[in-house]
Amino acid sequence: MSLLFLDTFAGISGDMFLGLLVDLGVPLPSIQEGLDRLPVTGYQLHQQRTERQHVAACKIIVEHEEQHHHRTWRDIDRMLAESSLKPTVVDLARRIFRRIGEAEAKIHGRALDEVHFHEVGAIDSIVDIVGAAVGLDYLHPDRIVCAPLPLTRGTVHCAHGSFPLPAPATLEILRGLPTVGDTAEVELVTPTGAAIAAETAEFGDLPAMTLERVGYGAGDRQLSDRPNLLRGLLGTADDPWEGETDRITILECHLDDANPEWLGALMEHLLEEGALDVAFAPLQMKKNRPGVHLTVLAPQDKTVALARRILRESTAGGLRYQEATRFKLRRQIERLTTPLGEVHIKLFYEGDKLLRLAPEFDSCQKLAQSSGLPLPEIYRLAEQTAYDFFRKKG
């Protein structure tokens, strides 16, 4: 499994990430070819060898004539939809833009469609975000891990004036993700950089890996206390996971005053809304009240809808959420014939290796009802049929 580790000792921005990808071996012409598929003109893209505190790095420079072009979320979404980019590239770029847009919408108290992108709607930010999606598609690491992002103090100047660091949009984007405090008084993590990391990486320490390449993407400033670089380590994970991974949101809250009948209905409604899993666990709460701990595993695009459902249909006054990477076994259903009829068997694979199998409950229950035999006996028959089938199959 190929692994990319983002060492964010000096933070992350869109242009630093793009420079890192090029320094790791992504050809700039390949990124340019992808950007040419957008209905955006009037800019030139260059790479430059530079150094930060005597460390050589790649700096990406975007030259353009555009002045303060404010694009809306609909403009960005339409631009991506009308492009001839690969669907996977469009999907990642859209998720990065949307994450920034949702942060801006929350800060300004507006709907997403009413948000005007200022800095992020400019040509150079469009190049950074779409270029990052194109470059990652070329590099195609199986897994990306990012170190916790450094949050600094000071002020930053933007279209709405001066704001204290960390920038409000950056904080919204990084909700639920690991960060560390930093004594620098300059912006190290930009909203674009934060959104790229949040949408592409899991967060943690450097995993065990066989290192193959190291790249450096340069930021604009010369920092006094460290090289202003985003460092990337590309290699192979020493203990590769050959199954699947995805990103989910975990929603949680404690309830001590909910009618149990409502909770049963809430679980049904959450699953109908698209939750991957819903669980209740008993706990003892303040004032010695018995309560329940609600946990919901949500696809990222269903997070807000499921959170709204919880808050509307339970007694919760708030809830916690965090994003997580999920390791998954690939699932497959095999239909096998037993002396009593057809039964469905669930197969679980890591990569191409079959790890286990299990009879599917509904089909076993149907056979138990039609045959009059106990359900455990049907399970044993289904398991034996499956083991015999796969033993012969090899």
From Swiss-Prot:
Signal peptide: none
Molecular functions per Gene Ontology: lyase activity; nickel cation binding
Keywords linked to the UniProt accession: Nickel
InterPro entries named in the record: Ni_insertion
Pfam families, per database record: Ni_insertion
HAMAP family: LarC (MF_01074)
NCBIfam families: nickel pincer cofactor biosynthesis protein LarC
Stated family: Belongs to the LarC family.
Stated name of the protein: Putative nickel insertion protein
Species of origin: Syntrophotalea carbinolica (strain DSM 2380 / NBRC 103641 / GraBd1)
Organism lineage string: Bacteria, Pseudomonadati, Thermodesulfobacteriota, Desulfuromonadia, Desulfuromonadales
